[in-house]
């Protein structure tokens, strides 16, 4: 699968972005959270310490002193168009 197709599939599986006490929760279509977590982890962004994924929910944990707005910017760089399609809660 091409990188562009992988990004499109990741974006289309994301249902919502929720800011939660310095972390970010991503709600997905059931069965997609883990693959999106792997995509984010493989992007290798320093600002993101790690991810934890279940079936339809993904938690992004930023490194110390990294703002959530910076995490959102990192996601937008890795998944262009994410915030336009999904928005934030």
Segments from the language model and where they lie:
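S4-like RNA-binding module at protein N-termini
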Residues: 1-7
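Long, charge-dense
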Residues: 81-89
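Non-DNA-binding regulatory cores of transcription-related proteins
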Residues: 7-72, 76-78
């Amino acid at each position: 699968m091409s990188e562009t197709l992988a990004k499109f599939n990741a974006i289309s599986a994301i249902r919502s972005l929720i800011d939660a006490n310095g972390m970010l929760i991503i709600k997905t279509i059931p069965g997609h959270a883990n693959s999106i977590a792997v995509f984010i982890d493989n992007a290798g962004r320093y600002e993101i310490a790690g991810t934890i994924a279940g079936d339809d929910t993904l938690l992004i944990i930023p490194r110390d002193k990294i703002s959530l707005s910076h995490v959102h910017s990192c996601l937008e760089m890795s998944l262009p168009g994410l915030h336009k399609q999904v928005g934030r809660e």
